């Protein structure tokens, strides 16, 4: 039997517990440490990530999340990847904030399809005070269905974060998007510190943090490692980390960006799992461009949640039936449901 070659733990400062029931020691991750993880042979990296994953989660279980755009387009920010920006000519048309009954119908449909988490996104730079009453009502009503709630509304002041907490919000999403070094290449209207300040306000209100980023925007591996380092070194690191693979949309500055190598995306999932052992690593945008084998590798690397349904904000997503078929073929259980039957043949 061939042994697996690994870099010494002292070199990588691994967060892998000594025993499956042992707590991972807090640590600061250097970008160089994370680059060393990226550089591992692919099979060794996945083996490592699986060890960490199994020490903290049921490796054969995934959570289904549904994401609804409650206010689409017309955003004042100039994020180069985003078709909702008012700075770019895309097919996305601006809309007003959805009515509560429309949101509730979508939430009920998501629950009926097996989702246990419902995320609501609004294309705002930051929510206006006149909108806070409506979005907090959405949180209360969706939570009343028994769904875990998440919102992404842009930058938040401390008082707004507290209002969402008082309404019962479980998670707030505000992505870092990239490493600090690459950030200026894609966004000029919002600083990196603005994002960190919002995360601090969310954490200060006692809301769980959902924070990840986008890969495949033309960044280097070192810059991908820099993003993971930023996430892993947040104190504490996020409870939820969505990893997005760029969906290049016509009309945006990144429309012609070459796609990221698929194995590099899997490596990013694995590195996120190793550096943030107890976070929910969520396969997010870009999944429609992945074949089933690539998605299976992502689950092996430590992803344990997907966004489920036909759309992610303004981009398409694999059909729910296809996801169910894939879960059955892989023997994956959906959180909150009985295990799927194994498909033969």
UniProtKB/Swiss-Prot annotation:
Keywords from the named record: 2Fe-2S, 4Fe-4S, Biotin biosynthesis, Iron, Iron-sulfur, Metal-binding, S-adenosyl-L-methionine, Transferase
GO molecular function: 2 iron, 2 sulfur cluster binding; 4 iron, 4 sulfur cluster binding; biotin synthase activity; iron ion binding
Binding-site residues, [4Fe-4S] cluster: 75, 79, 82
GO biological process terms, semicolon-separated: biotin biosynthetic process
Pathway: Cofactor biosynthesis; biotin biosynthesis; biotin from 7,8-diaminononanoate: step 2/2
EC primary class: transferase
Cofactor entry: [4Fe-4S] cluster; [2Fe-2S] cluster
SMART domains: BATS, Elp3
Pfam families: BATS (PF06968), Radical_SAM (PF04055)
Annotated ranges, domain Radical SAM core: 60-287
Catalytic activity: (4R,5S)-dethiobiotin + (sulfur carrier)-SH + 2 reduced [2Fe-2S]-[ferredoxin] + 2 S-adenosyl-L-methionine = (sulfur carrier)-H + biotin + 2 5'-deoxyadenosine + 2 L-methionine + 2 oxidized [2Fe-2S]-[ferredoxin]
Purpose: Catalyzes the conversion of dethiobiotin (DTB) to biotin by the insertion of a sulfur atom into dethiobiotin via a radical-based mechanism.
Family per similarity comment: Belongs to the radical SAM superfamily. Biotin synthase family.
NCBIfam families: bioB (TIGR00433)
PANTHER family on file: BIOTIN SYNTHASE, BIOTIN SYNTHASE, MITOCHONDRIAL
Entries under HAMAP family matching the protein: BioB
Protein name: Biotin synthase
The species this protein was found in: Polaromonas naphthalenivorans (strain CJ2)
Lineage: Bacteria, Pseudomonadati, Pseudomonadota, Betaproteobacteria, Burkholderiales
Gene name of this polypeptide: bioB
């Amino acid at each position: 039997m061939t042994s697996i070659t690994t870099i010494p733990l002292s070199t990588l400062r691994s967060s892998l517990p000594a025993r499956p029931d042992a707590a991972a020691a807090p640590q600061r991750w250097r970008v160089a440490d994370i680059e060393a993880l990226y550089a591992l042979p692919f099979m060794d990296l996945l083996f490592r990530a699986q060890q960490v994953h199994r020490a903290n989660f049921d490796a054969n279980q995934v959570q289904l999340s549904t994401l609804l755009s409650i206010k689409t387009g017309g955003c004042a920010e100039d994020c180069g990847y985003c078709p909702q920006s008012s700075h770019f000519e895309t097919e996305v048309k601006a809309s007003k904030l959805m009515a509560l009954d429309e949101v509730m119908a979508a939430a009920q449909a998501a629950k009926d399809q097996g989702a246990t988490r419902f995320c609501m996104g609004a294309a705002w730079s930051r929510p206006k005070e006149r909108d806070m009453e409506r979005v907090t009502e959405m949180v209360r009503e969706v939570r009343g269905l028994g769904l875990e709630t998440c919102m992404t509304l842009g930058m938040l002041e401390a008082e707004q974060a507290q209002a969402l907490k008082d309404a019962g919000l479980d998670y707030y999403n505000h992505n870092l998007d990239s490493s600090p070094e690459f950030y200026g290449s894609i966004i000029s209207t919002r600083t990196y510190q603005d994002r960190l300040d919002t995360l601090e306000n969310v954490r200060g209100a006692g809301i769980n943090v959902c924070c990840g980023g986008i890969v495949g925007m033309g960044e280097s591996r070192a810059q991908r490692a820099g993003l993971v380092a930023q996430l892993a070194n947040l104190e504490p690191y996020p409870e939820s980390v969505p990893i997005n693979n760029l969906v290049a949309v016509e009309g945006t500055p990144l429309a012609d960006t070459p796609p990221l190598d698929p194995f590099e995306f899997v490596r990013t999932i694995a590195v996120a799992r190793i550096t943030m052992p107890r976070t929910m690593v969520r396969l997010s945008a870009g999944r429609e461009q992945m074949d089933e084998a690539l998605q299976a590798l992502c689950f092996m690397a430590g992803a344990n949640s997907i966004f489920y349904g036909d759309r992610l904000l303004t981009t398409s997503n694999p059909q729910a039936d296809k996801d169910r078929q894939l879960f059955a073929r892989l023997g994956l259980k959906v959180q909150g449901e009985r295990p799927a039957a194994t498909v033969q043949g």
